[in-house]
Structures are given as structure tokens and as C-alpha cells.
Amino acid sequence: MADSRDEPLVLGIETSCDETGVGIVRGTTLLADAIASSVDEHARFGGVVPEVASRAHLEAMVPTIQRALKEAGVSAKDLDGIAVTAGPGLAGALLVGVSAAKAYAYALGKPLYGVNHLASHICVDQLEHGPLPEPTMALLVSGGHSSLLLSTDITSDVRPMGATIDDAAGEAFDKIARVLNLGFPGGPVIDRYAREGDPKAIAFPRGLTGPRDPAYDFSFSGLKTAVARWIEAKRAAGEEVPVRDVSASFQEAVVDVLTRKAVRACKDEGVDHLMIGGGVAANSRLRALAQERCEAAGIRLRVPRPKLCTDNGAMVAALGAEMVARGRAASDWDLSADSSLPVTDPHVPGRAHTHAHTHGHDHVHEVSKENLYS
């Protein structure tokens, strides 16, 4: 077995939405996962406000990097690379992270790796369950994405199988939570109420499940509208809305479609491993139904612990470490944020394949043990 010190030591920065995440990994071992969330600042607006998120990232970036280095017990000088989410995500939020990573990598004389947010959500599973089997089918569900992806090489070959044609699953959870006056974010609170409700109480529609519908695409807009109208009709009639039953029935409609299509994709492609990631993967019913259906189909299910399902820097560091380990080219210094970066680009390599440490200057200045560059 190789010495763990030979495994890449990588720091990852995540700012695609409202979490400022900084993670540090050595190979597939998680050393630090520091997060500063601005979710409370967005709650009063009922959703993420891009400008608020960007400003929060600016304020949290340096303290979060410092916290991660301290938690990991490593020196910045010993890092083998800096990875950062280059997209997709909110443009302004991404720009804060990319700018910070570029400055930090250049100052340290370390290679920079701009990586894909969705590919990072897949790769984070390695920190919990070891190397990803190749190929692996991945179901990624969050407030911004609902995608089925086939990964044969997480650093270079990720193929989209299906995606939502309208709203993401997480967005639907947030919307229904608002209609039920349960607050933001909606996923955790719906999950909580649903545990005490009857998932068969109300027959809500399952989008794109007909014989002529796309096999792997999702649609949650119709479901969202149907649930909202059902609630409004109850209120208009002066009747009490059964919040727990509505939550359970709505949640069941979402996870039924997600798991059904994911298992079908595995069967059709002959893939015996399914990984589920993204914020909605923390949902207890999604995990339970996926396990049940995967066992019945002879498919191995891999789901990271809930904290690693939501946005974090550890997942970015994990993918960055994989890039280093496989000898992938570092990004150029003109790396920019791309809010619509396709998942077919797991990372953004440099045109000339130049690494940070070849620029010929020593920019490492140790000021104190708390200094970012020490």
C-alpha cells in the first residue's frame, strides 16, 4: 500500500450558490470541510439572492480558508494544488471563488484546477466509500439540478443521460414549502413533516412517466402546480390543509420518479452501481426508496452522508485530487467562471498545459501560523 503522504494534498473552494465551502483532502481521505452558509440571509426572501450570496462569499472566504487549514493541520506550502468550482452556478458567486483560488494558487506557486460542480458532487462519494467504480450512474438532485449522469472517468468522461426539462426537484421542495408556510429551505422541513404523514393520502401526478415520454428526463413543474392548486382549493373552501399528508404525498411523487428513472437507466446501460448526490440526496425517503429499488434490481447504491450531499469544498478538493492523481492538465491563469459549464467538461484544462509552479517566481511569504500562505 502506498504511503498516504504520496497522495495529492488538495484544497478545494466551492462558491456556486450560497455556501462558502473550503475542503482539504489527501487522496480520498477527508481532512477538513469548513463551510460558511448565508442561508439565513436569504430566508426572508424565500430563495437565494445572487448579490447577497456574492457579498457573503467575499466576507467569508479568507476566514473559511484559515479554518480549513487549521482543521486539517496542514501547511498551505505543502498543498499539491488548488481546485475551485468554475461552474455551473450563479455567475457572481462563482467569480468570487475563482478569483480567490487563482490568487491563492498563484501566490503559493501551486497548480490551479477549475472543476465542474456536478462532477464534484459525484466525486465526493470517494471520500466516504472509496474509489468510484467505472462506470457509475449518478443521480444528482438539488435546488438547481436534477440530472442522470453516466461517468466512466470522473476526470474526463461524464455523459448526460437525462435532466429536468423545467424545474429542479429541490426547487419544487422550496416552492411547496413556501405555499405551506413552512419557510426556506424547503427540503429539510418537508422531509420532517412527511415522516408523520401518509404518502398515499393524495394522488399527485408523476411527470414524464408515460410510455412515450423521455425515459430519463424529469419534469416537476406540473407537480408543483398541482400541489399548489390543491392547497389553494382547500383554503378557498375554508378547510384545514393537512400539512403532513400533503408533504408526504408530494415528496413521494418526487422520489418515486427520481428512483424509478435512475434504476431504469442503470438497467438499460448495464451499470451495477448507482450514486446519488446533491442537496436533495439528504432526503430520508429518497434514500430509503432508492435502497429498496436498488436491492430489488441487484444494483449497489452509494450515497454520501447528508453533510457531503449539500454544497461543500470537500467535493471540489476530492475532484481536484483525482485530477492531480491522474495527471490531468492544470487550468490556465485566465480561468473564468462559467455559469453554464456543461457536465461534459469535468474540468477546465489549460490550453498550453502549463502548471502554476512553472511561472518562475517565489510568492510564498510566511507571516505567521495564521497566515493563509503558511
Curated annotation (Swiss-Prot):
It is an enzyme of class 2 (transferase). CDD domains: ASKHA_NBD_TsaD_bac. It holds the Pfam family TsaD. It catalyses: L-threonylcarbamoyladenylate + adenosine(37) in tRNA = N(6)-L-threonylcarbamoyladenosine(37) in tRNA + AMP + H(+). Residues 359-374 have a biased composition (Basic and acidic residues). Substrate binds at residues 140-144, 174, 187, 191, 283. It is found in: Cytoplasm. The keyword Transferase applies. Its EC number is 2.3.1.234. Keywords: Acyltransferase, Cytoplasm, Iron, Metal-binding, Transferase, tRNA processing. Binds 1 Fe(2+) ion per subunit. GO terms for molecular function: iron ion binding; N(6)-L-threonylcarbamoyladenine synthase activity. Its cofactor is Fe(2+). Residues 347-374 are annotated as: Disordered. GO terms for biological process: tRNA threonylcarbamoyladenosine modification. NCBIfam families: gcp_kae1, T6A_TsaD_YgjD. Belongs to the KAE1 / TsaD family. PANTHER family: TRNA N6-ADENOSINE THREONYLCARBAMOYLTRANSFERASE (PTHR11735), TRNA N6-ADENOSINE THREONYLCARBAMOYLTRANSFERASE, MITOCHONDRIAL (PTHR11735:SF6). Required for the formation of a threonylcarbamoyl group on adenosine at position 37 (t(6)A37) in tRNAs that read codons beginning with adenine. Is involved in the transfer of the threonylcarbamoyl moiety of threonylcarbamoyl-AMP (TC-AMP) to the N6 group of A37, together with TsaE and TsaB. TsaD likely plays a direct catalytic role in this reaction. This is tRNA N6-adenosine threonylcarbamoyltransferase. The lineage of its organism: Bacteria, Bacillati, Actinomycetota, Actinomycetes, Kitasatosporales.
